[in-house]
Amino acid sequence: MRITLAQVDSRPGELDANVARAEQVIAEAVSTGTDLVVFPELSLSGYTIGDLKEDISIPPDDERMVKLARAANKGAGVLFGFPEAQAHGLHIYNSAAYYEDGQLVHVHRKLFLPNYATFEERKHFLPGQSSRAFPIMGGRHRAATLICNDAWQPQL
């Protein structure tokens, strides 16, 4: 399995610019034969959510997300970090969505939100409720997603 780790410098609050950059990264990765492109936490929004004046959360079926999923529709799966809107913006999660063949397969909502030093995620997000494995590569493999602080938890 070839995995591309997309190291991108996201622009805080600039969804369209970040989506355009992600599209370039996906095209380049797919052209090299990658099987999976993985983007960082909150890569589509930038991490500094608290500094933004407006809510930029989006649902996993947002047209920009679907566009990116289709860009990888040449045999590669893609995982994006984004602020997920639910219930008309009343619930916002720090999420990662996995797409394959242009379709949403799984959304992981960050479970363990830090709230110390410069990390104030609990002020902006609700924690997810569970973590589970999901099929990748046409069901030939299974994977699970952890977002940053989730990986430091011994129970996971």
Briefly describe each language-model feature range.
Residues D9, S43, P83-A85, W152:
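Catalytic metal-binding/acid-base residues of hydrolase active sites
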Residues K74-Q86:
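Short, conserved loop-to-beta-strand elements that form functional interface hotspots
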Residues P60-E63, A87-L156:
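Active-site catalytic loop in hydrolytic enzyme cores
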Residues M1-L5:
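Extreme N-terminal starter segment of soluble prokaryotic enzymes
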Residues Q7-G13:
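Short polar catalytic/cofactor-binding loops
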Residues N18, I26-I56, L79-F80, D150:
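Active-site beta-strand/loop signature of hydrolases that rely on acidic residues for catalysis
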Residues E23-G33, R64-K74:
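A short, N-terminal amphipathic alpha-helix
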Residues A17, R21, D55-E63, H91:
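Alpha-helix N-cap and loop-to-helix initiation/capping positions
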